[in-house]
A protein has these predicted regions:
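Catalytic cores of nucleic-acid ligases and guanylyltransferases
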Residues: 1-197
Length: 197
């Protein structure tokens, strides 16, 4: 009896039967696994494709990238160090392929891992203390470091406000293009409060 839950305590078992069936095929008596659902051809997250796939708008390839094991066949392993839990998880997933994937790790040089993540266009890295027990939610034992990219854009327009928002909905952005004058690059609407508007 496999149940899949989001980090916001939303029950997703019926939305992703291919993941449910793959976890059931592991043949475990009982387990609590922690991971991230990824949509796309590789192992890099495409959040927009994930949302569209879960809503039924698109048919993305889903992968459940597993990075922790908290309970296995009647034994609570959440208090064991992270590296022990990951070794157990890797043994559980041995020989398994998509849609399940073991989320590998790098020990040591965080700066190098961050650089490689940037080269591969990943969102960033998660750094965890290898000797620590599991804690749900954020803690001092792990950090998320995102890749930061910046550029300069011109505001070329805006959309009308919706709901209780006043002023504008979002700002339309463009950058100079030698062939076409201006090239639309997207919109931004977060970060503005009523006082700024």
């Amino acid at each position: 009896n496999v149940q899949l839950w989001s980090r916001n305590a939303l029950e997703w078992t019926g939305k992703i039967p291919e993941i449910r069936d793959a976890v059931a095929a592991l043949g475990l008596t009982s387990a609590a696994l922690d991971g991230e659902l990824i949509a796309g051809a590789g192992t890099k997250e495409d959040f927009n494709l994930l949302q569209a796939t879960l809503s039924g708008e698109r048919q993305g390839v889903l992968t459940y990238a597993l990075f922790d094991l908290l309970h296995l066949d009647g034994v609570d392993v959440a208090d064991a160090p992270l590296l022990e839990r990951k070794a157990l998880l890797q043994s559980v997933l041995e020989g398994q392929g998509r849609p399940l994937a073991f989320s590998s790790h790098v020990q040591g040089d965080g700066d190098e891992a961050y650089r490689v993540a940037g080269e591969q266009h990943f969102e960033g890295i998660i750094s965890k203390r290898a000797d620590r027990s599991y804690h749900s939610g954020r803690s001092e034992d792990w950090r998320k470091t995102k890749q930061l990219a910046s550029d300069e854009f011109a505001v070329v327009g805006y959309t009308a406000p919706k709901g209780s928002r006043t002023g504008f909905g979002s700002l339309l952005l463009a950058k100079p293009d030698p062939e076409h004058g201006w090239l639309y690059v997207g919109r931004v609407g977060s970060g503005f409060n009523d006082e700024l508007m």
